[in-house]
Amino acid sequence: MKHLTEMVRQHKAGKTNAIYAVCSAHPLVLEAAIRYASANQTPLLIEATSNQVDQFGGYTGMTPADFRGFVCQLADSLNFPQDALILGGDHLGPNRWQNLPAAQAMANADDLIKSYVAAGFKKIHLDCSMSCQDDPIPLTDDIVAERAARLAKVAEETCREHFGEADLEYVIGTEVPVPGGAHETLSELAVTTPDAARATLEAHRHAFEKQGLNAIWPRIIALVVQPGVEFDHTNVIDYQPAKASALSQMVENYETLIFEAHSTDYQTPQSLRQLVIDHFAILKVGPALTFALREALFSLAAIEEELVPAKACSGLRQVLENVMLDRPEYWQSHYHGDGNARRLARGYSYSDRVRYYWPDSQIDDAFAHLVRNLADSPIPLPLISQYLPLQYVKVRSGELQPTPRELIINHIQDILAQYHTACEGQ
């Protein structure tokens, strides 16, 4: 069943429903999401970005086929039906190769698209908005659209070759800030204008026509725009519906199209719901989920220090800090200020650059050590109340087992619950 096309159809019919996209490769985040979708009997959209996963391995070391295998194996182990699982590729284009000449970057992008589509990813976000080494800055709408159409043609051919039919669903366009949270401190954010959104759509329609791709236009289900939501290290720019009202009304003129909103992390439940009502019917969430994972782990590390002799502790927080200092490439260009400001950002920033470090073997060993230390005997309830108060309420009511893994997963699911509630149609 084409869950996304059906969601869009219902939304356009006035149901004010939506779907959220889980943008993470962390096993505990994915387990939390799969179990939550299973309990609520909803489809689950999981997306990999072109930074995380590509034909060369991305920063996770996984190709699209590897990522699909990893997610499907996890879903099978949790008895989640694969036909309820939707895999998406985010910001697919020359993003990873902006330092190369355009011809070379786009050749890599062709292969990127082939690898995602051949692996069975069905939601494809075509994003060619970034300038390559020999490109003007910024690119014109026409160049962006021509490159996206070229990739769409590759995607269609690959899909037919591997699956006998072309059943992909596409997202086009981009938000203005770079993927993964803003680098700088923010105070105000420009909302995409209706004219800019229309220009993007028309440029893409024209470019797709030139490639003989008219027939796929109804499968372009969403346009990525900037509704005025973003976060930096310590601040969140909240959705202001009045500023996006003209943009929201503009999409009502398109029969099969809704908006996709990126960087919705840390918005209030009320803002998430209002975004859905205003036709931002695909809500992307990623850093907020690994932020919740990090919160739970820091809380458990504090509990461990109360219960376990210092020599036997995992030292998770210190191990994490040491590895981040030894390998600063994932945070150095994002976190500024004096030593103390950077230390705080490494641990607590909304941008959650720490998420890039969880796969590190030293950190993973410390995580396993922490879980072992706290799994040996029951965690005292007063300590759960002190450090994980929301989970404490559920433990006391009997709906949650107070084991380290269950406490972590439930804390992540508290964020997923906000998205689920926002996406439930009337």
UniProtKB/Swiss-Prot annotation:
Coiled coil: none
SUPFAM superfamilies (alphabetical): Aldolase (SSF51569)
GO cellular component, one term: plasma membrane
Pfam families listed in its UniProt record: GatZ_KbaZ-like
Organism lineage string: Bacteria, Pseudomonadati, Pseudomonadota, Gammaproteobacteria, Enterobacterales
Alphabetized NCBIfam families for the sequence: agaZ_gatZ (TIGR02810), PRK15458.1 (NF012002)
Family recorded in the similarity comment: Belongs to the GatZ/KbaZ family. KbaZ subfamily.
Recorded name of the encoding gene: kbaZ
Subunit structure comment from the entry: Forms a complex with KbaY.
BP-aspect Gene Ontology terms: carbohydrate metabolic process; D-tagatose 6-phosphate catabolic process; phosphoenolpyruvate-dependent sugar phosphotransferase system
Protein name as it appears in the record: D-tagatose-1,6-bisphosphate aldolase subunit KbaZ
Superkingdom of this protein's organism: Bacteria
Role of this protein: Component of the tagatose-1,6-bisphosphate aldolase KbaYZ that is required for full activity and stability of the Y subunit. Could have a chaperone-like function for the proper and stable folding of KbaY. When expressed alone, KbaZ does not show any aldolase activity.
Classification via PANTHER family: D-TAGATOSE-1,6-BISPHOSPHATE ALDOLASE SUBUNIT KBAZ (PTHR32502:SF2), N-ACETYLGALACTOSAMINE PERMEASE II COMPONENT-RELATED (PTHR32502)
